[in-house]
């Protein structure tokens, strides 16, 4: 009888332990499936882009694709030079970064170093709300408000132009840069700030000469995320910058970006498997490689200037 009483708790313990191990294994399996699904999705996207692009480059020379200054794949006299789309993408991105990087950095410094916690809890959510506005709303805001405003300053500015598109794209990516940069600055140890104050530095000097350099790795990551976001913006560029593929580096002119062209062609009724249809995937692969290049550069810079505390 006594032995039976001792065996019962032991069996309950073993049963409980087995059930806990099963739950842990199930959780691990779910997490593994989640991680695997994201990797599988990326592999599927790359496979689709590459397979269709290979078929495209069997008909079009890679040299022509990379060096030709005309992009007219839907015309009777077709040209397949990606440079006009790349230039439009880079110009709008450069204008966006010229707005978002200084404003986002200053906003991050203010939220991290100067504002009180109560005011931060009001300002930061309002700033992050900009990231939740649909891009089509930004596009029409650029076309119907920003462009007419700029035309009062620049009378010869056309209705479609990369300047207004880039300015609004800068506002759109501002929350990404400011929020991540602020998180990086707030992660800087308090001891660095106190040491700076002890040396007689002002709050601004501490923020700019101590905190900002110490957080530069995370801030670079914010900049790269902003670049990747700007490069991939579709509706703002399609609505405000126009759909005319043109090799120009002048932001006051109209042009087409890679994403805008993809939208333009995908809304048509091109036959599946045609050369014109395959230009979508060649342009998409170019966009992926462009974004990948920015991400690799950002990773290198972040690693190069990373501080370990």
Predicted segments — roles?
Residues 103-142, 180, 308-309:
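Cytoplasmic-entry segments and transmembrane alpha-helices of multi-pass inner-membrane transporters
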Residues 152, 237-288:
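Interhelical loop and adjacent transmembrane-helix boundary motif
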Residues 40, 89, 93, 97-105, ...:
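Hydrophobic positions within alpha-helical transmembrane segments of bacterial inner-membrane proteins
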Residues 1-35, 298-309:
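Transmembrane alpha-helical segments of polytopic membrane transport and secretion proteins
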